[in-house]
């Protein structure tokens, strides 16, 4: 996997992973994806659809409409079929890091949301079950990061990390209650990040 970033050392890869997470958390999915694509030198997706920052869509490209993705600054572009066998590369790892940043942001929104609601005369966020769910989610995000750092060259581990992040986003969305299921919810970024991962993370024989 790391051969796709010529000259990169394990330490520099670690720094790139952390930077992709930081950008995803601070600036959002589109900025994070842009950082990951540039670092990985990615060109062709493993399938027929590429997820790209909207401002990087090639002129004249056929774009698959998706309102939620558009609001996140992401476009899904039809791509010419490649004769190369799909293979997991460094972009799958870096996109995983971006998704961790997006997931952390979603969890923080959930904590803020619950802090402003009360149940039984106290903030909902203080309820034992809610505290446990938040703690579990944060621990899982840390575990996902560690997996990318130490097992990023193991395709099955990278695919599993993306699956776990999808589950984490769903759990955080449920903490937002009904507001997590409207278009303008912060959960939108988590949903679109899953679609982006579906474009760039091949799921062949891992």
Please report, for each region that a protein language model flagged, where it lies by residue:
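Glycine-rich phosphate/cofactor-binding loops in nucleotide/flavin-utilizing enzymes
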Residues: 1-37, 72-76, 176-206
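Generic detector of well-ordered alpha-helical segments enriched in charged/polar residues
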Residues: 14-18, 30, 34, 111, ...
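Glycine-rich beta->alpha junctions and the first turn(s) of the following alpha-helix
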Residues: 32, 36, 42-139
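C-terminal helix-coil-helix/basic helical segment that borders enzyme active sites and/or dimer interfaces
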Residues: 122, 138-166, 170-183
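Short, conserved alpha-helical segments within structured domains
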Residues: 126, 130-133, 157-164, 187-188
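Short, charged low-complexity intrinsically disordered segments located at boundaries
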Residues: 135-145, 198-203
